[in-house]
């Protein structure tokens, strides 16, 4: 795959072209470890799918107001090594936030990021970071359109349960910055969710 040839809708140079390798590039931050184990990948995928099915079955009582309506077109996600590679390249820059260009040949790619820190030498399990995204459901108003909700409060949740998204792949890095032990998780989603003129899923 020649990522340097991919033209993203938002412009910019593709992350996998710009940085080009899995070598961490974190300046004065001390890298402890990077990458996800096979088990962690399975756990992250299972957490996404368990949550999507909880929403689909109408079992999510949280919301503003809750509960969330059940879905009729919510499929399970599958893991994508390609999306995971691009997510890992971005995570390895130790820059919290979204990269500009991460699309792949077949579709636009969405992204969720999470960062936790502790003064103690402990690092949160990646599933805990995924649950932080799920918790945004408490601010979601299902009686309003997606575009009428406050995106800054709910955007990670909505990407997680976006029905048209089929694949997910994530990357992770743990590093120390000014005595803070940080765990940074990046998940990429394809096809991307969070389109302003669409809805999360079809309600039953």
UniProtKB/Swiss-Prot annotation:
<dbReference type="InterPro" id="IPR014044">
    <property type="entry name" value="CAP_dom"/>
</dbReference>
<feature type="disulfide bond">
    <location>
        <begin position="170"/>
        <end position="187"/>
    </location>
</feature>
<dbReference type="GO" id="GO:0005576">
    <property type="term" value="C:extracellular region"/>
</dbReference>
<protein>
    <recommendedName>
        <fullName>Venom allergen 5</fullName>
    </recommendedName>
</protein>
<dbReference type="InterPro" id="IPR001283">
    <property type="entry name" value="CRISP-related"/>
</dbReference>
<dbReference type="InterPro" id="IPR035940">
    <property type="entry name" value="CAP_sf"/>
</dbReference>
<keyword id="KW-0020">Allergen</keyword>
<feature type="domain" description="SCP">
    <location>
        <begin position="45"/>
        <end position="189"/>
    </location>
</feature>
<comment type="similarity">
    <text>Belongs to the CRISP family. Venom allergen 5-like subfamily.</text>
</comment>
<feature type="disulfide bond">
    <location>
        <begin position="26"/>
        <end position="94"/>
    </location>
</feature>
<keyword id="KW-1015">Disulfide bond</keyword>
<dbReference type="InterPro" id="IPR002413">
    <property type="entry name" value="V5_allergen-like"/>
</dbReference>
<dbReference type="Pfam" id="PF00188">
    <property type="entry name" value="CAP"/>
</dbReference>
<feature type="disulfide bond">
    <location>
        <begin position="4"/>
        <end position="17"/>
    </location>
</feature>
<feature type="disulfide bond">
    <location>
        <begin position="8"/>
        <end position="101"/>
    </location>
</feature>
<dbReference type="InterPro" id="IPR018244">
    <property type="entry name" value="Allrgn_V5/Tpx1_CS"/>
</dbReference>
<keyword id="KW-0964">Secreted</keyword>
């Amino acid at each position: 795959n020649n990522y340097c040839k991919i033209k993203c809708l938002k412009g910019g140079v593709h992350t996998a072209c710009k940085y080009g390798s899995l070598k961490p590039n974190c300046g004065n931050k001390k890298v402890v470890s990077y990458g996800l184990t096979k088990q962690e990948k399975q756990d992250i995928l299972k957490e996404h799918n368990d949550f999507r099915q909880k929403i689909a079955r109408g079992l999510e009582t949280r919301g503003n107001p809750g509960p969330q309506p059940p879905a009729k077109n919510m499929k399970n996600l599958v893991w994508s090594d390609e999306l995971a590679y691009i997510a890992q390249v971005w995570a390895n820059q130790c820059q919290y936030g979204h990269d500009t260009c991460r699309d792949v040949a077949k579709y636009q790619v969405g992204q969720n990021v999470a960062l936790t820190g502790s003064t103690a030498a402990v690092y949160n399990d990646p599933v805990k970071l995924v649950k932080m995204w799920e918790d945004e459901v408490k601010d979601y108003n299902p009686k309003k359109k997606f575009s009428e909700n406050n995106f800054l409060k709910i955007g990670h949740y909505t990407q997680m349960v976006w029905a048209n998204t089929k694949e997910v792949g994530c990357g992770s890095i743990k590093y120390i910055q000014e005595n803070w032990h940080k765990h940074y998780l990046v998940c990429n989603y394809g096809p991307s969710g969070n389109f302003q003129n669409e809805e999360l899923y079809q309600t039953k």
